[in-house]
C-alpha cells in the first residue's frame, strides 16, 4: 500500500527507517551507541520525539548524563527531522547548534528529545529542541537551537 511521503504515516515510517539505518549500518558508531527510539511524530506540527536511555558510560564526573551526550542526542534528533523534511534526497549536516543546560539528566533512565521545525528552506533548516526526563516531561532539562545545511544529492528539475 502506497502513501504520501509528506503525511503522518510517511513521517513515522521514514523516521523509523532512519533509526533502523543507524542501528544496522552504523554498528559500533556513536549514533548507534546512542540507540534512538521513536516515541512520537507529528506531521502537522513538523516535530518528532525520540527516546534515549542514559547508559552508565554516558556519565560525566558528577555522575549525571554528560552534556556532550545530550548535545549529540539533540543534534541527531534535529538532524533526522531535517533529513526527512529535505525529502530524504540529501544530507543535512549541522551548520550551528546552541545548547542550554537547565537541569541535570539522570543516568539509567530514559530521556526524550523533541525537535520542532521552525524554518524549512531551500538551503537551511532551523529547529528548536528540548530534552526532558521521561518521568518528568513538563520540566525541560536542556534546550537547543540547530541550523542544518540542506545539501541536495541531485539537482531539482
Language model segments and positions:
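A short interface-forming secondary-structure element
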Residues: 54-62, 70
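Hydrophobic beta-strand-centered segment that forms part of the acyl-chain substrate-binding groove
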Residues: 81-112
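Active-site helix/loop of acyl-thioester processing domains in fatty-acid/polyketide metabolism
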Residues: 68-88
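Non-catalytic linker/capping segments at the edges of enzyme domains
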Residues: 1-51, 56
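HotDog/MaoC-like acyl-thioester-processing domains
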Residues: 1-16, 105-107, 118-157
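Intrinsic-disorder/low-complexity, polar/charged segments enriched in Ser/Thr/Lys/Arg/Asp/Glu/Gln
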Residues: 33, 45-49, 96, 110-112, ...
